[in-house]
Amino acid sequence: MTNAKILVAHISESDADEAIRKIKKVNEKSGPFDLIIIFSNSYDENFELNTDGLPQLILLSCDKANNSKSKKINENVTLLHNMGTYKLANGITLSYFIYPDDTLQGEKKSILDEFGKSEDQVDILLTKEWGLSISERCGRLSGSEVVDELAKKLQARYHFAFSDEINFYELEPFQWERERLSRFLNIPKYGSGKKWAYAFNMPIGDNELKDEPEPPNLIANPYNSVVTNSNKRPLETETENSFDGDKQVLANREKNENKKIRTILPSSCHFCFSNPNLEDHMIISIGKLVYLTTAKGPLSVPKGDMDISGHCLIIPIEHIPKLDPSKNAELTQSILAYEASLVKMNYIKFDMCTIVFEIQSERSIHFHKQVIPVPKYLVLKFCSALDRQVHFNNEKFTRNAKLEFQCYDSHSSKQYVDVINNQSNNYLQFTVYETPEADPKIYLATFNASETIDLQFGRRVLAFLLNLPRRVKWNSSTCLQTKQQETIEAEKFQKAYRTYDISLTEN
C-alpha cells in the first residue's frame, strides 16, 4: 500500500517564523512529510518564509482582490487563493474555498459553478468555515449550507476547516454511499494552546478503498441523518462551556417541520451546574432560581467610568429551553429582578442605558437573557439600528424567517402578556431601558419553529448601534479573552455589582 504522509497546520503571519521552526522540528522527528498544508487568514506573497529543508508546502489565503487560483512562490511553496482545485504530482487532489462566513452566501453561485463542472475525485477538501450539518451535530451555531453542498458533492476523504481559531475538533469517521470514508477536522491557530498541527497518513492510488479498513468508531453520515443525540467527540478546550448566549440556541435550518429537536442533557449543557466543565470563574452572582455570569467574547467594551465590558447573561439554574411566564411566575419575577438590578447599576454607577436581548424558542437548549450597557446618546438610535438589520434579514438573507417587530410600552401591556403567555409562540425580543424608573420599550418579533432564524441577529443589531462591527462574532480573535482576562472581568463586575446584587437580600 502506498501512503502519503501529510501535515496540516494553522498559523498567522505574526507567528510564522516561530511556527515554521516548530514545523521543521516535527518534520525531522515524525517525517519526512510528503506535503505540508498551511492555513492562514491572510498571507502576503511578498512575506518571506524560511522553508529550507521542508517538503512541498501549500499555503492557503483568502484575497478577493487576487483572481489567480494558484501561484508558485518558490520551488517548493505554492500559494492557493480563494477557491479552486489543485492536483499534486503524486495524484492527490485538493479542493479549496476559503471565503469567510459573511461572504460565502454571496459567492455561492461562483462556488457552485467552479466545482459543479468538476469530475475529479477529491482527496482533501479545505475550507475556512464548517458545514452546517456538522456544526449542528456539535451544538455550534456557525455553519454554512454552501459548505454542506460542496462537501456532499465532492465527498472528500479529509475535510479540514479553520474558522474556530481556539479549538481542535475531530469528528469520528463516516462513510459515503460509495463506501468512501471521510473525516472532518478543525485546526486551531498556533498559539491557541491546542493541537494546531495535525499529521496523518493517507493511502493514495487506485486501491484506497481496499487498503483502508473500516474503523471501529464509524458513525452515521452527518450529511444524511438528523441528529437527535450528542454522539460526538467534545471540543478539546476549557472554553467549550461558553457563556455566550448565541452558542446555546439551535435553530431548525431545515424546512422539514417534523425534524426532531436535538436533546441536550443538563450534564452536557453549557449553562447547567451539573456540567463538570462549567466555567464558574465567570459567574458574578447566584440567586435561588437564577444566576448571573459575564459573557464569553463580550460585545460591549469598557467605556468612560465603566472598566468592564458590562455584557452579561441572566440564566435560570433549572435546565429549561423555553420560559413559560404563566407557569413559572416565581422564576420570571426573579429574572426580571436581576434585570432591573443591572439596569439600575448601569444607570447610576456608569451613566448608561441598558438593552436586553433574548430568544424564546422551543428549539433552544437553555433559556437565558443577554444584558448589554448602551450609552445614553446611542439608545435613541436603537430603532434605526433594528430597522436596518431587519431589512438585511428580510431582503438579503431570503432563507431566514421574515421578521416584523411589534413595540409594546411595558411588561404589563395586555397585548404583550398575551403573546408571551402563548406557548405556541416563538420570538426574538429586545427590551430597551432608558432609565430604571421609566417603563421599558419592548420590541418583539414572532417566528415559526420550523423557520431558520439568524441566531446572531441581536448581536448584529447592537454591534451596529455601538459602532463595533468587528465584535459581531463572540469567538473572533477581537472578542475572545484569556481565562485570566475573564477572571479579572468577573471580579471587577462582582465588585461593581455588589451594591445591587439581589442574591444578597433573597430569602
UniProtKB/Swiss-Prot annotation:
Q: Taxonomic classification, please?
A: Eukaryota, Fungi, Dikarya, Ascomycota, Saccharomycotina
Q: Which residues carry this modification: Phosphoserine?
A: S242
Instruction: Specify the species.
Output: Saccharomyces cerevisiae (strain ATCC 204508 / S288c) (Baker's yeast)
Molecular function (GO) terms for this protein are: enzyme activator activity; RNA lariat debranching enzyme activator activity
Instruction: Tell me the subunit arrangement.
Output: Interacts with DBR1. Interacts with SYF1, a component of the NTC complex. Interacts with lariat-introns and lariat-intermediates.
Instruction: List the keywords (alphabetical).
Output: Cytoplasm, mRNA processing, Nucleus, Phosphoprotein
The reported effect of H366A is: Causes accumulation of pre-mRNA splicing intermediates
Spell out the family assignment given in the record's similarity comment: Belongs to the CWF19 family.
Q: What is the effect of changing C272A?
A: Causes accumulation of pre-mRNA splicing intermediates
The protein's role, per its UniProt record: Involved in branched RNA metabolism, modulating the turnover of lariat-intron pre-mRNAs by the lariat-debranching enzyme DBR1. Enhances the debranching activity of DBR1 in vitro.
Tell me what this protein is called. CWF19-like protein DRN1
Q: Which Gene Ontology cellular-component terms appear in the entry? A: cytosol; nucleus; post-mRNA release spliceosomal complex
Knockout phenotype, as recorded, reads: Accumulates pre-mRNA splicing intermediates.
* Record GO biological process: mRNA splicing, via spliceosome
Per the UniProt record, one Pfam family is CwfJ_C_2
| Location in the cell | Nucleus; Cytoplasm
Q: Which domain of life is it from?
A: Eukaryota
What more is known? Present with 1270 molecules/cell in log phase SD medium.
